[in-house]
Amino acid sequence: MFSFEGDFKTRPKVSLGGASRKEEKASLLHRTQEERRKREEERRRLKNAIIIQSFIRGYRDRKQQYSIQRSAFDRCATLSQSGGAFPIANGPNLTLLVRQLLFFYKQNEDSKRLIWLYQNLIKHSSLFVKQLDGSERLTCLFQIKRLMSLCCRLLQNCNDDSLNVALPMRMLEVFSSENTYLPVLQDASYVVSVIEQILHYMIHNGYYRSLYLLINSKLPSSIEYSDLSRVPIAKILLENVLKPLHFTYNSCPEGARQQVFTAFTEEFLAAPFTDQIFHFIIPALADAQTVFPYEPFLNALLLIESRCSRKSGGAPWLFYFVLTVGENYLGALSEEGLLVYLRVLQTFLSQLPVSPASASCHDSASDSEEESEEADKPSSPEDGRLSVSYITEECLKKLDTKQQTNTLLNLVWRDSASEEVFTTMASVCHTLMVQHRMMVPKVRLLYSLAFNARFLRHLWFLISSMSTRMITGSMVPLLQVISRGSPMSFEDSSRIIPLFYLFSSLFSHSLISIHDNEFFGDPIEVVGQRQSSMMPFTLEELIMLSRCLRDACLGIIKLAYPETKPEVREEYITAFQSIGVTTSSEMQQCIQMEQKRWIQLFKVITNLVKMLKSRDTRRNFCPPNHWLSEQEDIKADKVTQLYVPASRHVWRFRRMGRIGPLQSTLDVGLESPPLSVSEERQLAVLTELPFVVPFEERVKIFQRLIYADKQEVQGDGPFLDGINVTIRRNYIYEDAYDKLSPENEPDLKKRIRVHLLNAHGLDEAGIDGGGIFREFLNELLKSGFNPNQGFFKTTNEGLLYPNPAAQMLVGDSFARHYYFLGRMLGKALYENMLVELPFAGFFLSKLLGTSADVDIHHLASLDPEVYKNLLFLKSYEDDVEELGLNFTVVNNDLGEAQVVELKFGGKDIPVTSANRIAYIHLVADYRLNRQIRQHCLAFRQGLANVVSLEWLRMFDQQEIQVLISGAQVPISLEDLKSFTNYSGGYSADHPVIKVFWRVVEGFTDEEKRKLLKFVTSCSRPPLLGFKELYPAFCIHNGGSDLERLPTASTCMNLLKLPEFYDETLLRSKLLYAIECAAGFELS
């Protein structure tokens, strides 16, 4: 309110209460919290002090009571020994002594007292056990259990020399025996219950751990099972090992049995084997007379494997035990028991570490070579324990025995075999091949399954029938999911990958031994008897199967290069957690392993597809365009953008031994941009499955890659560095071999200009603008590959292959000639020249393959007679030794017979029914590979010096022949007319030209080829039409002299045609000229 008393300023207020004591709110809260903290701290200190004081008082009182009871025990013991007022042969007195001892017992102080008590309990066991039948039965039972547990603890100190282990062992024997209880208690069921409780209490208190230590301490390391009767303690220890197993198996429910087997497994078997365990205990348990409960043990093992193998690394020891003991019990297993056995193999084989032996036998293309370097040495005992690597190798050997193989095969071949049997077997085989790198011919099981047509058919049926439920609720085959490249759940991939991998590996191996006649279902007659075929599929089935395999490969490529970065999906997290994987790093590792499985699957499927494609190439069984895929739309202009000039490397990536987003296959320079997903997929297809792309498109890709490389090396300008050589026409090969050698001209990609000298040593007219070089290269290749030159021979069909006797003709320099010829053929491909050189199919296959060797199926293209004889030998049913063969071959080179051994000491090794397959393959290998290995290697190196083999591997052997020599297709005159030039006054409308084309239209196809060869030196049209012919086909006015013949300059693809206006005359003159081959320098 306002004052209207006339005051114009505020008067100061005076407070008579002194200074203000108000606190800020924050300060007040802080002070309050601090006081509360101090009070809480004081209460905590007081409580702790009370606890400590209570503990100290309790400890002091207990120690005092221990001393009192210990003294009382000693007095009773003294009285009993002196025959005083405390007789020991009294049940209640024994109970009192036990109660006292259990109260104060300390092992370091009271061991002797315990031993004394054991001695009396054993002596008066019936009196003590009788307490189980009275009111103190629960107390007595508890005391027995505690005494047995003290036995176990005492025996764990068995290394103490002052300890007498005989009494504790006798105590275990007496109070775990039915014979101790039955005479006193009478009730058999109650006795069983008592012993069951005692044994389980012992088991939970380290019974088997005590036996493990006791065996290793008290038995000599040199002991073997045969020494059982000579070492009394060995027999007792073995009985103690078996007693809980036998008792629980015969008298206890499954839950109790499981506990005993768990302790036996974790404490006794999962630890590294000592010599005593390895040479005595395991052979003893494996003996059929021991009656080990093998089938219940297998059932229990499946439930406890995760604890006893993953965490402690006990898988090798357990697996060895299972295999060794199983040798005498497999025959007695029920069908359900065999299935459990198969599951055990599946479980422990996957946890078995990779042994150095299996790692070293794997080929160099393996993805995990580093594992073998870190593995242990085979067998070097450390502290008396066998090494893991030694046990691993022993496990793999035992798994490969005849008995094991027959057991597993019988399980699979039963009519009642379920899908689970096949899937579990596939998982076992998959682990053997992938993780342990075992090759099919080296493992009995794999080899036997590979040649069982019924198994392969059923395997493919299972693969085809596997399906998964989609989000929409519909069931979709897993093969279809793979073919689409759609992501698959962890569970589904775990189901199909082992089956698919096994099928592809086994079928691939069987195809190696199935010759073409058997593959195509031709009847085989040997000595009047028809042989059964090992082919599991008909040709019609193979067509569908090959299509599925092709699409699966393409789908896996899509999975390997996903459109988006893969994430850990929810079902993967659930699946990983079910097997104990929880951390993100563990999940990432599991994902990497999963993707590695897809990569490995891709390899084997691709190999099988290529083998089927190779069969179809040699002899068609698939319809036209069967191998082409509608999924892939790869165009030359897109792919060739990936060419990297600076690196001079084809695709910017190395050949796909591995694919996947985690293992990049790219080898891109720092300046190169990263490839898109589409580009990565295209490169993967062209590298691994090029035949799914049309041949014409691949030819375009090849030519555009050549053009890109040529632009870098040669350029468009005429003044860039090139190669200038002078060649004598009569010595074309000799001069070219000298002047175009690697030492003189290391880079044949450069433009070559040739100056020719005629037979008189005079210069031939003309400047080389490319035509003379092409003429020269054509003549050079004809000369070099002429069988008369000695470097190449011809098969019965007139096809070229390296002459094995070339070294005898030209000496040790023969490899240089093959290197030179390889470079020259590469130069022809590089310059897009067609040369009519018909090569043998096996030779082209050797050039294209990643390995220089080819298999027996190519022998038919080299020597059909030898191939036929080997097939006869393979199917021969009489005594093979009667044929008088040994492991040698005879060469008749240049009239000189030479005996060559196929293997060391081969002349002394007869060919028998057992080793004839090895003989057949060695003969084929010698003829196809060993004889000409150096020739082919040098030729391939020369070819790769000019044209990368990666480019050529886009084509099969037949396609490469077409690339070299052109296709056997009719000549299109319309195409030829469209790309023909005219000179010297001629034009398309000139009367002579019109007559010429009418005449040519009337030619047969053979006459048209002769005309083309007359003008261009090659009877086949260019692969992509006459627009690719360089220089272009040209008709030049040859003058008005009607007596002259048409002539040609093949170096310029030029036809010199006189002015023949009469159709009959032109026809006769032209036919005469092309038949007589009037050519170079005759115009």
UniProtKB/Swiss-Prot annotation:
Question: Which reaction is this enzyme known to catalyze?
Answer: S-ubiquitinyl-[E2 ubiquitin-conjugating enzyme]-L-cysteine + [acceptor protein]-L-lysine = [E2 ubiquitin-conjugating enzyme]-L-cysteine + N(6)-ubiquitinyl-[acceptor protein]-L-lysine
Segments spanning the bilayer are: none
A Pfam family this protein belongs to? HECT
- Recorded consequence of changing residue 1049 to H: Reduced E3 ubiquitin-protein ligase activity
> What post-translational events are described?
Autoubiquitinated; promoting its own degradation.
Please describe, based on the UniProt annotation, the reported consequence of changing residue 1013 to Q: Increased E3 ubiquitin-protein ligase activity
**Keyword field contains Transferase:** yes
**Function (record text):** E3 ubiquitin-protein ligase that specifically catalyzes 'Lys-29'- and 'Lys-48'-linked polyubiquitin chains. Accepts ubiquitin from the E2 ubiquitin-conjugating enzyme UBE2D1 in the form of a thioester and then directly transfers the ubiquitin to targeted substrates. Associates with the proteasome and promotes elongation of ubiquitin chains on substrates bound to the 26S proteasome.
Q: How does it assemble?
A: Interacts with 26S proteasomes. Interacts (via the HECT domain) with UBE2D1 and, less efficiently, with UBE2L3.
- This chain belongs to which protein, by name? Ubiquitin-protein ligase E3C
